[in-house]
A protein has these predicted regions:
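Active-site proximal beta-strand in glycosyltransferases
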Residues: 67-72, 83-103, 118-121
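Short N-terminal targeting/anchoring amphipathic segment
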Residues: 1, 58-78, 94, 209
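A short alpha->beta transition loop at the rim of the catalytic pocket in nucleotide-sugar-dependent
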Residues: 204, 224-228
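Conserved donor-binding/catalytic core segment of Leloir-type glycosyltransferases
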Residues: 148-169, 175-178
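A charged, aromatic-enriched C-terminal amphipathic alpha-helix characteristic of glycosyltransferases
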Residues: 5, 268-302
């Protein structure tokens, strides 16, 4: 899978480290149609036809791989069969959870995780659902692709909000808050990734989401561009992240109830926006640099081989 470009970023970083890594997808992601090495292009209907393609792929790639790294709770063929086959073939398996695949689920519903050799979450906030995660490995960005432009001072700052899901990200609360403030608001939704990037590069302030306990890839990209980010954060996860990586989390934490209050200082102070934006870029370099993320994966792989 290649949700938010995660898988494609990972395999390219691993290849730069000398690892023979390939990304297999069932279908290309709509807004990232070129990001894959192997596209199964599964039939859109017909379970038996889909399974036939998936089983042929497993038969082809089983001899070629030492580790199968899966995403989002999905495996190449049904887990009840895929994992015993991997064990019988002496292949290792990793499951990387991405958020919606675990959020709100019980440990009993996620019991299948223990059948993998390792299971990963992307933030300490996610350990509320998977407290026994083998590792916490945050998403990575190739920072060579993210050069920030100098911030611009203006009377009406531009707030950008780019929800993948309007309801889940709390878009109505963002709209309501901005309506009470001297700002312009751009809600970026349902557009190709390249267009979304160009629009949030113009932002003075970025608001990520109001319902979850941690930020998403959009917030990471925004910080990489030097933008101050506002989102809902779990305080315990903030403390755990700062302890693990030795750096302050520079995101402004807000809820739907205090969003106006948290936005106002950033709106009033250009210098504060510059400072928080610079701290965000430094944070991403420390925690989300793709080369460092690849090193964390390589260390994990070595521990299970």
């Amino acid at each position: 899978m290649n949700l938010a470009g995660t898988g494609w970023a990972h395999v390219n970083a691993l290849r730069r480290k000398g690892v023979d890594a390939r990304l297999l997808v069932f279908w290309p992601q709509k807004w990232r149609p070129e990001e894959y090495d192997i596209n199964l292009d599964l039939p859109r209907s017909g379970l038996l036809r889909q399974q036939a393609v998936q089983w042929r792929a497993l038969a082809r790639y089983l001899p070629q791989a030492d580790i199968f790294h899966f995403y989002f709770g999905k495996t190449l063929v049904p887990k009840s069969l895929n994992l015993p086959i991997l064990r019988a073939a002496r292949k290792k398996s990793v499951m990387q959870f991405l958020g919606d695949d675990i959020r709100g689920k019980t440990l009993h519903e996620l019991e299948y995780r223990k059948k993998f050799d390792a299971w990963i979450v992307g933030s300490y906030a996610a350990t509320r659902w998977v407290p026994d995660a083998t590792a916490v490995i945050p998403p990575g960005l190739d920072l060579r692709d993210y050069e920030s432009d100098p911030p611009v001072e203006r009377d009406r700052p531009l707030v950008v909000h780019a929800p993948s899901d309007l309801e889940k990200k709390g878009t109505r609360h963002v709209i309501a808050a901005c309506a009470q403030l001297p700002v312009d608001l751009d809600v970026v939704h349902g557009v190709p990734h390249e267009e979304a990037v160009e629009r949030f590069k113009r932002a003075d302030i970025v608001v990520d989401q109001m319902h979850y306990h941690w930020h998403g890839v959009f917030a990471i990209e925004s910080m990489a561009y030097g933008k101050p980010v506002v989102t809902h954060l779990d305080p315990q996860a903030v403390a755990q992240t700062e302890e693990a990586f030795g750096v302050k989390v520079p995101i402004v934490s807000a809820t739907k109830d205090d969003l106006v209050e948290k936005l106002r200082p950033l709106i009033d102070s250009f210098e504060l926006r510059k400072r928080v934006g610079a701290e965000g870029r430094a944070y991403v370099e420390r925690v989300h640099d793709l080369d460092k993320v690849a090193d964390r994966f390589i260390e994990l792989y070595a521990s299970i081989l």
